[in-house]
Structure formats: C-alpha cells, structure tokens
Amino acid sequence: MLCPHCHHNGSRVIDSRPAEDGMSIRRRRECVNCGFRFTTFERYEETPLLVVKKDGTREEFNRQKILNGLVRSAEKRPVSMDKLTKIADHVEARVRRLGENEVSSQVIGEFVMNELKPVDEIAYIRFASVYRQFKDVDAFFKEIESMKKEER
C-alpha cells in the first residue's frame, strides 16, 4: 500500500480489528520508509446493486450520493460529519440487507428520512423537500404538520 506521506510502496500492519459496522476491518499501518502511521479500511467486494430511479432508468448504487444529499440538507446545522456518515452507512446496510439486486430510489429516500428525522428535524425537512419534490408551500406545511402530529 502506498504511504500517503512519502508515496513509498511498502507498509506494515501494526493493529487490525473489526470496524464499528462489523462489515469491514480497520488496520493501522506504518510506512517502512518514513515511519508515517495511517489507517486503512478493508471491505469485501459486494455484488453490484442497481437503483431504479423514478423515470425507470437504472444506475449503480452510490453511497456517496446519499452522503452528498445528507451534507446538503444538514448545511449550517449542528450535525457532525461523523453522524452523517453513520446515517449513510446505516442506509447502505439496510438496502443491502434487503437482499435484492435492484432497489427503488423511493425506498432509499424513505430509509434516509427515517434515519435523519430523529437527528435533526430541519435537515429532515430540507431532505424531504427535495426528495418528495413539494409542489407548493401547502405540501411543505402538510409535511411539517404531520411531524407535529407524530410528536404528540
């Protein structure tokens, strides 16, 4: 593995343990050339998962797209990047546990909203407004009213 500091092609593993999600291994490495220490994660290669979009087109599942949407919805909100990453991890795990080769973008969107709602309601509303494509202000207010009813 290339050292991120000196780009030498050689490192040794100092420590290895399961990552928090149980789906990967976290390894601490040390460059044999410069002694720089860095962390890598090893994951098994998964079978391709296709997302069926609203228009019927298919594209390969991309966890980064989920994370980008979460970051946009939580902009200027007190939600850490670590928390958003964990949400993306949970959503990906839920999607993969379905055991299907294809999953609709609607299912993924619902999973994201279920994870985001208890974390930050403003970020949730922002995400929902894009995901559900509110046509007007009334649709926006209906979503807020439904949230209020659930709190009671």
Curated annotation (Swiss-Prot):
Cofactor field: Zn(2+)
PROSITE patterns per UniProt: ATP_CONE
Zinc finger residue extent: unnamed: 3-34
GO terms for biological process, alphabetical: negative regulation of DNA-templated transcription
Keywords in alphabetical order: ATP-binding, DNA-binding, Metal-binding, Nucleotide-binding, Repressor, Transcription, Transcription regulation, Zinc, Zinc-finger
Family membership noted in the UniProt record: Belongs to the NrdR family.
4Fe-4S is among the record's keywords: no
Record's function text: Negatively regulates transcription of bacterial ribonucleotide reductase nrd genes and operons by binding to NrdR-boxes.
Cystine bridges: none
Co-factor remark: Binds 1 zinc ion.
Name of protein: Transcriptional repressor NrdR
GO molecular function, one term: DNA binding
Domain ATP-cone per the UniProt entry, residue ranges: 49-139
Domain of life: Bacteria
